[in-house]
C-alpha cells in the first residue's frame, strides 16, 4: 500500500505513514495522535445562483 501524507495538529509537520505496516497513527516527531489529511491546493469553482 502506498504511503499517505498527513499533517500533525500539534507540531504542524507533514508525516508520511505506510498504513499497511503502521498499527497506530502517531506523529513520529511529537507523539500526537491528531493527524489531518491535507486538502488539495486546487481551487474549486462554485456557480452562483
From Swiss-Prot:
GO cellular component, one term: cytoplasm
InterPro entries, sorted: RNAP_P/RPABC4, RPABC4/Spt4, Rpo12
Location in the cell: Cytoplasm
GO MF annotation terms: DNA binding; DNA-directed RNA polymerase activity; zinc ion binding
Binding site for Zn(2+): 11, 27, 30
Record keywords: Cytoplasm, DNA-directed RNA polymerase, Metal-binding, Nucleotidyltransferase, Transcription, Transferase, Zinc
Location (main, coarse): cytoplasm
Taxonomic superkingdom: Archaea
Gene3D superfamilies given in the database record: RNA polymerase ii, chain L
Keyword ATP-binding attributed: no
Note on cofactor: Binds 1 zinc ion.
Cofactor section: Zn(2+)
GO terms classed as biological process: DNA-templated transcription
Catalytic activity reported: RNA(n) + a ribonucleoside 5'-triphosphate = RNA(n+1) + diphosphate
E.C. number(s) listed in UniProt: 2.7.7.6
Disulfide bonds: none
Assembly behavior: Part of the RNA polymerase complex.
Function: DNA-dependent RNA polymerase (RNAP) catalyzes the transcription of DNA into RNA using the four ribonucleoside triphosphates as substrates.
Family per record: Belongs to the archaeal Rpo12/eukaryotic RPC10 RNA polymerase subunit family.
NCBIfam families linked: PRK00398.1-4 (NF001607)
Listed name of the protein: DNA-directed RNA polymerase subunit Rpo12
Organism encoding this protein: Pyrococcus horikoshii (strain ATCC 700860 / DSM 12428 / JCM 9974 / NBRC 100139 / OT-3)
